[in-house]
A protein has these predicted regions:
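Positively charged, helix-rich recognition surfaces that bind polyanionic ligands
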Residues: 1-240
């Protein structure tokens, strides 16, 4: 349920204005990559969250194999079922704690930099659209369409609103592939997005800035007057 997140009509507002707006790109390794109107940037890592999920899946897989060799309803099968429930409960509590820290750190950074509005890519709706292979491949859907991703978005929106920060969710299609300098579409490889026109930028912050551009201008394009810093870009790295 995403009732606390508002969707606004498309606007074309200046990239830089009296408001400091931040674009946020969500990811599996870096939960939130942020880039604002004043060219401040930060990355809030979600590595621990991914590690928790991997450990949970490994443990559940081992139990499932043992249960397959047991008779359903037997004492052994029931013991394994209880162990499975304990793993799920423990993992859920650990995830909730990490999600709180990740979203709290992100909102604290927004407050520190005077952010008045968050524009974030709508990966949850994309992940639900399982027939649209062009927008998100199956592997990425499995990574992003999960409980943790939805909770991250919920918690971020809740904390933002409690601090008086507006939040807008937009279609994030092409924000990772589009070069804002020449408009070329290129699938990023490695940690740096590189285009044949000479544009280079940190891959995750490239996506966040394109979300900011798309949400404020209605198109992914930078102007010479933007005074955009060149790669390597300076950013804060926050380990939750």
């Amino acid at each position: 349920m995403l009732s606390i997140i508002e969707r606004f009509p498309k606007k074309q507002t200046p990239y830089s204005s009296n408001q400091n707006i931040v674009g946020i790109d969500m990811g599996e390794i870096h939960s939130f990559s942020c880039y604002d109107s004043n060219h401040n940037a930060c990355i809030v890592t979600g590595r621990q969250l991914r590690s928790l999920n991997r450990l949970r899946n490994k443990q559940l897989g081992e139990i499932q194999n043992l249960q397959s060799a047991s008779t359903k309803g037997s004492n052994r099968w029931e013991e394994l079922q209880k162990a499975k429930m304990k793993i799920l409960e423990r993992n859920s509590n650990q995830q909730k704690d990490l999600i709180h820290k990740i979203t709290r750190n992100t909102i604290d950074w927004c407050i520190q930099h005077g952010i008045t509005k968050i524009i974030i890519g709508d990966i949850v709706d994309i992940a639900r659209n399982t027939k649209n292979e062009k927008r998100l491949n199956r592997k990425n859907r499995q990574k992003m369409s999960n409980w943790a991703t939805r909770k991250l978005l919920h918690n971020l929106a809740y904390k933002a609103k409690s601090e008086g920060i507006m939040i807008e969710v937009i279609d994030e299609s092409y924000t990772t592939k589009t070069c804002p300098s020449c408009g070329n579409h290129k699938k990023p490889k490695g940690r740096i997005y590189k285009c044949s026109c000479g544009y280079e930028f940190h891959r995750d912050l490239h996506g966040a800035r394109n979300i900011l551009l798309k949400g404020t201008r209605g198109k992914i394009e930078i102007y010479p007057s933007d005074n955009v810093p060149q790669n390597p870009v300076t950013f804060e790295y926050i380990n939750s």
